Each structure stands twice: as structure tokens, then as C-alpha cells.
A protein has these predicted regions:
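Short alpha-helical
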Residues: 13, 39, 66
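Structural micro-motif
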Residues: 49-59, 68-69
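A local structural micro-motif
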Residues: 30, 52, 82-83
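Thiol-based oxidoreductase modules, predominantly thioredoxin-like and allied folds used
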Residues: 29-41
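Local sequence-structure signature of Cys/Sec-based thiol-disulfide redox active-site neighborhoods
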Residues: 1-31
């Protein structure tokens, strides 16, 4: 099983969509809620590959996937399941 991590804000609709997709696949993930936590946000930015500060930011097996658009696109292309296995 893949190690999945997601950085979120509490009331972010895109974060909720990404988590719903993972939940629909019964994928366990570690969620880091970074509301008002600048050090956690900086850690997220440092881990990423594009300097992106928006959420969600998703990592699978320590590889930066991107945000909700990226994970939804992987799902539409039929590529997400292989990353998660």
C-alpha cells in the first residue's frame, strides 16, 4: 500500500474533493491541516516540486503529485490506482 500524505486547510473545498476521492478508494492517508501554521506550510512548500503554496498538496510515496486537479486527472486517466498500489 502506498504512503499517501495530503496538506489541507479545514474548510477548503478542493481539499475535501481530494480526500473524498481517496476515501472512495479506501486509501489511508496522513492529513496535515495547516490552518494558520506557517511552519507547516513552509514544510509543504519545501517538499513540493513547484513552490506551490496552495492546498491541497498531495504526496504519494514521498513523490509530489500536486493538488486536487492533478489527482483528479490521474483518476480520469486511469493512472491513480497504480500509484496507490
Amino acid at each position: 500500500m502506498a504512503k499517501v500524505e495530503i496538506y489541507t486547510w479545514s474548510y477548503c473545498p478542493y481539499c475535501m474533493q481530494a480526500k473524498q476521492l481517496l476515501d472512495s478508494k479506501n486509501i489511508e492517508y496522513s492529513e496535515y491541516v495547516i490552518d494558520d501554521d506557517e511552519s507547516a506550510r513552509e514544510a509543504m512548500v519545501q517538499r513540493g516540486t513547484d513552490g506551490e503554496r496552495s492546498v491541497p498538496q498531495i504526496f504519494i510515496n514521498n513523490s509530489h503529485i500536486g493538488g486536487n486537479d492533478a489527482i483528479q486527472q490521474l483518476e480520469r486517466q486511469g493512472k491513480l490506482d497504480s500509484l496507490l498500489s
